[in-house]
């Protein structure tokens, strides 16, 4: 692990990166990309948490929704997959659930808005095979083609 979360103070996140350089420039660049992606994941995880609730009951259309507690979910970001514990709500009647974080952060399927935008742009230039390859080669992001196709439909 090369990216370490040092502090979260108000709107500021401080991280520390330790990157081992190589005698090969290409290898060094790959190591730098991986470290920056790791840092991006850590900071994006903190950014996503800011859109969550404190777990208090909420009213939607006059109906009371209560938190089922914090449940983990993986989100796709430009930097990698991030796991976030977030509150999921349900009415006393059961049925469908609601996640305020996903509404307020404008999550698309399970992608952050920036990642969804990147994927949409890449689809404008080619099919899912090319998008999958481009993300892996140019961004260090390995994403299943089936996920990309599902994201494209949204």
Task: Report the location of each language-model feature.
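Short, positively charged, Gly/Tyr-enriched micro-motifs
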Residues: 82-154
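Short, conserved DNA-binding cores of transcription-related domains
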Residues: 1-92
């Amino acid at each position: 692990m090369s990216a370490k979360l040092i502090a979260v103070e108000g709107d500021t996140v401080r991280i520390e990166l330790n990157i081992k350089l190589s005698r090969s420039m290409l290898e060094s660049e790959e190591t730098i990309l991986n470290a920056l992606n790791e840092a991006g994941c850590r900071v994006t995880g903190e950014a996503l948490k800011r859109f969550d609730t404190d777990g208090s009951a909420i009213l939607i259309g006059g109906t009371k929704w209560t938190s089922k507690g914090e449940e983990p979910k993986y989100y796709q970001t430009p930097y990698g997959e991030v796991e976030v514990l977030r509150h999921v709500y349900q009415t006393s009647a059961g049925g469908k659930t609601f996640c305020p974080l996903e509404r307020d952060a404008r999550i698309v399927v399970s992608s952050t808005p920036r990642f969804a935008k990147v994927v949409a742009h890449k689809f404008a230039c080619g099919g899912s095979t090319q998008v999958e390859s481009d993300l892996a080669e140019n961004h260090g992001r390995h994403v299943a083609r089936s996920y990309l196709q599902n994201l494209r439909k949204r």
